[in-house]
């Protein structure tokens, strides 16, 4: 019998090391079993990387993290080249170990009390008008990190009064009441929490999370702030069916969610969950039409769409795909 892995605080566990800690075991994908990417999934890199390197340098200077880098987002080059980024607070080590996600797992260090001010100054220096703030899961904190979110929102607005702030929050498992009490006092301009996939394969895709809990979080925030858009997103290609996706969309509308994102799942490494199918642009267009017919005010649906992809345009109701 193998000895249990003892995690050291502050150490990032990735790929095989991370997957070894997941209760639902995933079989490493052999190279010849990988699905070939279709033409529509091939991303062109910008010829000039000056802006990209500038944003990375600003992050490093202030000890900040972006989910774009930590989660290996395929849109990083495009977004950084346009001067946009999704900031990830509360460190770069997640207490969860979802097998679709490339963010490192482990025992995180204490939150940086100076991070809200450093984040606010960086955003002001970049002259951003719309910013997305997300975080790793912090099940080690009594409020799940909600107060840190609130502190960041307050600091950002103090330095950039005209800015619009979208928060992409974790599920605050076991801490919803405390977290919402804090966030209700300092709400963002858009409240985002991703369901990620469909109930049938939830335990495999999001071990440690609960589908109905996430729906309740979105519903309760909307009840407290009916004027603030609520948003959620799914990855497709993990084994779900289009019919199941449509049913999740109905669940989201029943819980008051007004904005939707749907994008293609891409396997970060052979140790992560494999891609089961590539959904065509035409299928995404059909699901977008279904979403708008259900009453979503905006639906960004396309192979390269991610939750915060062109989030400023999404918030304005402009076409994103």
Swiss-Prot record:
Iron as UniProt keyword: yes
GO (cellular component) term, any one: cytoplasm
Cofactor: [4Fe-4S] cluster
Subcellular location: Cytoplasm
A Pfam family this chain is assigned to: LIAS_N
Pathway as given in its UniProt record: Protein modification; protein lipoylation via endogenous pathway; protein N(6)-(lipoyl)lysine from octanoyl-[acyl-carrier-protein]: step 2/2
Enzyme class: transferase
Cofactor note: Binds 2 [4Fe-4S] clusters per subunit. One cluster is coordinated with 3 cysteines and an exchangeable S-adenosyl-L-methionine.
Residues the entry annotates as binding [4Fe-4S] cluster 2: 94, 98, 101
GO molecular function terms listed in the Swiss-Prot or TrEMBL record: 4 iron, 4 sulfur cluster binding; lipoate synthase activity; metal ion binding
Enzyme Commission number(s) from the entry: 2.8.1.8
Binding sites annotated in the UniProt record for [4Fe-4S] cluster 1: 68, 73, 79, 308
CDD domains assigned to the protein according to its UniProt record, in alphabetical order: Radical_SAM (cd01335)
Keywords carried by this UniProt record: 4Fe-4S, Cytoplasm, Iron, Iron-sulfur, Metal-binding, S-adenosyl-L-methionine, Transferase
Ranges annotated as spanning the membrane: none
Keyword 4Fe-4S included in the entry's annotation: yes
Chief place of localization: cytoplasm
Catalytic activity: [[Fe-S] cluster scaffold protein carrying a second [4Fe-4S](2+) cluster] + N(6)-octanoyl-L-lysyl-[protein] + 2 oxidized [2Fe-2S]-[ferredoxin] + 2 S-adenosyl-L-methionine + 4 H(+) = [[Fe-S] cluster scaffold protein] + N(6)-[(R)-dihydrolipoyl]-L-lysyl-[protein] + 4 Fe(3+) + 2 hydrogen sulfide + 2 5'-deoxyadenosine + 2 L-methionine + 2 reduced [2Fe-2S]-[ferredoxin]
Matches recorded under NCBIfam families: lipA, PRK05481.1, PRK12928.1
Family, similarity comment: Belongs to the radical SAM superfamily. Lipoyl synthase family.
Protein name in the entry: Lipoyl synthase
Gene name for this UniProt entry: lipA
